[in-house]
Amino acid sequence: MRRPKKYESGEATQYISRRAALRRLQLSLNDFRRLCILKGVYPREPKHRRRAQKGSSEIKILYHAKDIRFLLHESIVWTLRDYKIFAKKSGRDRAIKDFRNLKRRLALFPEIKLDHIVKERYPTFIDALKDLDDCLTLLFLFSTFPSLHLIPREQSALCRRLTIEFLHYVIASKSLRKVFISIKGYYFQAEIKGQKVTWIVPHYYPFKPQSRQDVDFKVMSIFVEFYTIMLGFVNFRLFHGLNLAYPPQFPSSVLQDNSETLQDESSFVSDRIAALNFELLRTDKLMEDEEELDIDMELLEQDGDSKRIIKMKQEAQEVARLRTLFKGLKFFINREVPREPLIILIRSFGGKVSWDASVFAGATFDESDETITHQIVDRPSLSTQYISRDYIQPQWVFDCINQRQLLPTNKYFMGEQLPPHLSPFVDSKRETYIPPEEKALHDPSLIETHVQSDDDDDDSDAEADNQEEEEIEQQLLDAQLQRAYQQETAEYKKYGGTDGVNEDEEDSVDDDDEEDEEEEEEEDVEQLDDKTKRLLEEKQKMKVESGKVHKVNKRQIRKAEVDEHRLQARMVKPRHRNLFRKLIREKQTKEKEEWLLRKKRRNIDADAKEAKKTAKREAKKAAAEAAAKALKMA
């Protein structure tokens, strides 16, 4: 039997370097990267790098040998090789100026088919929905790009079309659940087929060119190439699940015979689809008014009343109310407000929305409409205002959705300082410090207590302002009471201090009564049995003693905790010691962050309180000066 040699089995044969993979596949580095991105193959980190690299200590990029064997059977490899042949032959035709043959070759340009790869990577529709977060975020980003060297115009236009189609599904299904505004953009979370899908829509800023060292647009473009095919499949399935025509179409009532439709119907339809403000054509009219619920309430009622079932019922009822949050409300968006994110939010929750017709196509009513309930503005003032509507800032819409109720609009009026905008994506179980506003977001019953604490602060400020007046009144009252007491004492001495009864006689009468009572008690005790006598004797022995105050020494308690912690650290096994230190370091970092946040919050509250006091004093001072001026004028 032959003795096995070193590195012929085990971990050394499970991995292969990138250079060896390129030789085996006979591809260039760029083609290999493209193939790995499309197939979902990525580098691996071995457990023992020296063994995996057959004794070499050099840092190499390693792949699973099984993944490389998997790539050998991919049909795209032949298409990538055809690209190389096409480049050589077209370059030769261009060099000899054989443009006729070059035109023929360009018509036969090899194309990569990715349909089978999408089906291979996502066997079920739920698998595709689970991987939809990165897909949507990247496509929304590329939909805002202009035509670049590595990003053709057709790719950006395709990303824009697919993302608009997906937003139409979100609006029609009313599946939006959470929203948030940040520096990166607008965060959206929808619940589709029981899966939570989260994506980011970037802010609409002018495009700033990036250097090649910062962003590799070529690699990102390969991801987009795969994700466009994937999202096309997903949109097709989602639209047919709601009986919506795909590609999106409008009912005949929208396509009226006017000048715009007669000139160019395709551009008219595409503009209205991009406006996100019209209902789409349904293939089945019976399903138009029916809305599918994610949870079957009748099935839940049959399952009993366990805690889990009750929680699911409550969640289903909250979602049903949330889907009609803005029902019956009409919004008008001003020019300075971002149009598309607010249209998605308002229409996803049952509201009606419009804007200035000169900004974008698809406006359904004007600003002068008297039935408008809310106008969304982002400026300090307006020249003309209507009494029948509320002028609010855009944050009101986001906060109402996150708290699942219509909030009062007084804090969001035009020109007002907005309350803090809290993220609904924070996990309260993992975070150590939770501000009071966020607690109120997760538990609406805490809003009243938070408001009550603010009122208590105002009351304490008012008490501090009126403290001097109360002290003066108390001094006057004490002087009056002292004078009354002196008068009563003088009258008591004047009339002899008695009511005609001698004190010695009263004391003798009291002593006789006490002796009679003691004799009666002794007679009663003699008549009782021995057990009762014993109980009475024990009761007489019981007495109340003065207690002692035990002072808590915090330093000793802290020292005991530190000693216990050191004992636990010594008991940790040596192989787990690094992990233990890492956990302790993370815990200390969290505690420090919590302490800093609490300190920062205390400073902010103190500054706000001081500013409030200063404003009150200035207001009182101004009122006093105005009153003095009025007296002088009088």
From Swiss-Prot:
Feature: compositional bias, Basic and acidic residues: 528-548, 603-623
Any GO BP: maturation of 5.8S rRNA from tricistronic rRNA transcript (SSU-rRNA, 5.8S rRNA, LSU-rRNA)
Keyword rRNA processing: yes
Domain BRCT, first and last residues per copy: 321-414
GO molecular function: ribonucleoprotein complex binding; RNA binding
Localization of this protein: Nucleus, Nucleolus; Nucleus, Nucleoplasm
Family: Belongs to the pescadillo family.
Function: Required for maturation of ribosomal RNAs and formation of the large ribosomal subunit.
Protein name per UniProt: Pescadillo homolog
UniProt source species: Drosophila willistoni (Fruit fly)
Classification of source organism: Eukaryota, Metazoa, Ecdysozoa, Arthropoda, Hexapoda
